[in-house]
Amino acid sequence: MQLVALGLNHHTAPLAIREQLAFPAEQLADALRDLTGSQTAHEAAILSTCNRTEIYASARDIDSVLVWLARNRGLDVEVLRPYLYALDAEATARHAFRVASGLDSMVLGEAQ
């Protein structure tokens, strides 16, 4: 297992794509159970706002997370691929701190 992040945001995807990948609050618990129960990820967190959807996971590999995301949202992997970023362990940690501090937000410092 390795630490990975897979996501898209206001920099990488138009609103129409972001809306298709967004996880409503009432779906998050089931999505996390499915993600970790599918053997794709040992542990995971999903961050979903109007400006980003990101999956942080301890996973076998990033491609398995991508396949799970596409299946869960009912989309084709190849439709999603151009809009997504995939990060390795070091880049995942750096990115998580940028997001948490609001440095990667549409408006600097906001919580989205």
Where are these regions (language model features)?
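N-terminal ligand-binding/catalytic initiation module
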Residues: M1-Q112
